[in-house]
Regions:
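Unchanged
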Residues: 41-139
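A conserved beta-turn-beta hairpin within the catalytic core of GNAT-like acetyltransferases
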Residues: 30-32, 95
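Active-site beta-strand termini and strand-to-loop segments that position acidic
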Residues: 16-19, 28, 103-105
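Charged phosphate-binding loop/patch that engages nucleotide di/tri-phosphates or the phosphate backbone
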Residues: 130-156
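A short gly/proline-enriched turn/hairpin at secondary-structure junctions
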Residues: 35-39
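Acidic, metal-coordinating catalytic segment for phosphate/diphosphate chemistry
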Residues: 1-19, 90-91
């Protein structure tokens, strides 16, 4: 996936579920806002490789810890508000274009590790009911999350 002409950053997002179909959400260290694990796709990088790389970097889970249940049919975009755009992703993008993946933990006791990088993005995580993230995320991502969850719920 390459940066498209519309100025959206190519990105992967992951909904990780456990055996009781609770979803993993994480709190951003710098803004204290909640979100699913997500991250950019490097230029020329395979989308699934990017997804597994981000999963490992952000929450310490490997490909062996999860099963790939499914993915969104296409991509979903959201705009970053102009008032904060200069502070997000260096102001280079007007938003993100995300490919969404649904992953299931193979073992509920798989360890979630948030300190896998020199500058971890998250400082806390929780397992919550499937729709609860819609009430806890920043407003500008809400519709993208609703669209992704509405599509992925049929795969559970």
């Amino acid at each position: 996936m390459k940066e498209n002409s519309e100025g959206y950053r190519p990105n992967v997002a992951m909904v990780v579920i456990n055996s009781t179909n609770k979803v993993l959400i994480c709190r951003r260290k710098n803004t204290r806002t909640w979100q699913f694990p997500q991250g950019g796709i490097d230029n020329g990088e395979d989308i699934k490789k990017a997804m597994y790389r981000e999963l490992s970097e952000e929450v310490g889970l490997s490909k062996d810890d999860v099963s790939l249940v499914g993915e969104s049919e296409g991509t979903i975009t959201y705009d970053i508000p102009k008032t904060i755009r200069s502070k997000v992703l260096g102001g280079k993008f007007k938003g993100q274009e995300q490919k969404w993946f649904l992953l299931k933990l193979k073992k509920d006791n798989s360890e979630i590790k948030l300190d896998n990088e020199a500058f971890p993005e998250f400082d806390k995580y929780e397992w919550v009911s499937f729709w609860q993230p819609l009430n806890r995320i920043v407003d500008f991502k809400r519709e993208a999350y609703r669209e992704a969850l509405s599509e992925l719920r049929f795969l559970i």
